[in-house]
Regions:
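N-terminal cap/lid segment of alpha/beta-hydrolase-fold proteins
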Residues: 2-57
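Mobile cap/lid helix-loop segments that gate and shape the active-site cleft of serine hydrolases
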Residues: 9-12, 27, 203, 208-251
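Short, surface-exposed "cap/lid" segments of acyl-processing enzymes
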Residues: 41-93
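Short beta-to-alpha linker loops that shape the active-site pocket of alpha/beta-hydrolase fold enzymes
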Residues: 68, 99-109, 203, 298-299
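Conserved alpha/beta-hydrolase
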Residues: 87-112, 117-120
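Alpha/beta-hydrolase active-site loop
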Residues: 114-151
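Primarily recognizes the serine-hydrolase "nucleophile elbow" in alpha/beta-hydrolase
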Residues: 142-213
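C-terminal catalytic histidine-bearing segment of alpha/beta-hydrolase fold enzymes
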Residues: 263, 267-324
Length: 324
């Protein structure tokens, strides 16, 4: 069955790389239960491999989780394409493959062009945009499990995410009991956790973010409240539990963990830099992890839109992984 999922999408030529677009990682997948994969072209063949050919390269993988406040339909796996192509163009950074994961989104009734549910009640509801926690993180873990257990790749990898994708990066290495809370009967896919992560412009303490934003971001308080409640419901205890700042002892929580390469622009107009300060301080108090801060500039989405700094950050993370 896995081979059918994998083979349902062709390899396409993308310059120096091969690309599979929107590979489904579950049966009966929506368009958001998919991932994109890029891998370097093999030295030997000039023709495109058939759709059933699995990635063969040696070296670590990069798995990326897009942002968008768990709800933005215009930010998806393709947002990492410029970064993936640039990363794979460097011969001095051996990367076996890059995966960028889609996951179901929460509703966004006020989106200016793509509201969900639709404003016109006669239009069909998009079931891929009705997710509630823990749907997002369960989908991500399912995607990583598909890569590792079904395709047999990405056992050694850097996990990176932007904005809410940075939150999900930490959730991946947390004990699921933290973010599952009182949810019953939910099967959590088991994955091999990364040793190095690279969270970018992240949301790490939603309650602090909502209840006490810095003066520079106070005007966004209602926006923060809206997207948090959309994804996680009204219970503030849940907002706290899903966040990495709720972990009392990161050493026991993530024993595999070695390095966190963290970055945020101080000019981020959407997420206050105080979130990164909180997370850095929390990790230093509760773990023996090496916490490395990398330079980032511009506004919230400039990191992935411009690709230069994010490439440097991920290359740095891969460098740390290579030394372990």
């Amino acid at each position: 069955m896995t081979s059918q999922l994998w083979s349902s999408t062709p390899w396409v030529d993308s310059g120096n790389t091969l690309h599979k677009r929107r590979v489904p990682y579950i049966q009966d997948a929506t368009y958001l239960h998919t991932l994109d994969i890029w891998q370097p072209k093999s030295l030997g063949g000039s023709s495109l491999p058939t759709a059933d050919v699995l990635p063969q390269g040696k070296g670590p993988w990069v798995i990326y989780i897009h942002g968008g406040a768990w709800r933005d339909p215009l930010v998806d796996s393709s947002s990492f394409e410029a970064t993936a192509l640039k990363l794979l163009s460097y011969k001095d950074t051996p990367i076996a493959g890059v995966a960028s994961v889609n996951y179901p989104l929460s509703n966004h009734p006020n989106h200016p062009t793509h509201p969900a549910p639709p404003r016109d009640s006669s239009e069909p509801v998009d079931i891929a945009r009705e997710a509630k926690h823990p749907d997002h993180i369960i989908a991500l873990l399912t995607a990583i499990s598909f890569l590792q257990n079904d395709l047999g790749v990405s056992h050694d990898y850097v996990l990176s995410g932007h904005s809410c994708g940075a939150t999900m990066t930490f959730q991946t290495v947390m004990n699921p009991g933290h973010w599952l809370g009182t949810a019953k009967g939910i099967s959590v896919p088991e994955v091999k956790k990364p040793r190095v992560i690279a969270p970018l412009n992240g949301l790490y303490d939603l309650a602090a973010f909502i209840n006490n934003p810095p003066e520079s971001h106070k005007q966004l308080q209602q926006l923060y409240t809206d997207f948090t409640k959309n994804a996680f419901g009204d219970d503030e205890a849940v907002w706290k539990a899903v966040c990495p700042t709720s972990v009392a002892d990161w050493s026991t929580e993530w024993p595999e963990g070695k390095v966190v390469v963290i970055a945020q622009s101080k000019g981020d107009g959407l997420v206050p830099y105080a979130q990164t300060e909180l997370m850095k301080n929390h990790l230093r108090k509760t773990s023996a992890l090496e916490v490395v801060e990398m330079k980032a500039s511009g506004d919230h989405n400039d990191l992935w839109k411009q690709a230069d700094e994010i490439v440097d950050i991920i290359k740095c993370a891969i460098g740390y992984l290579a030394k372990l």
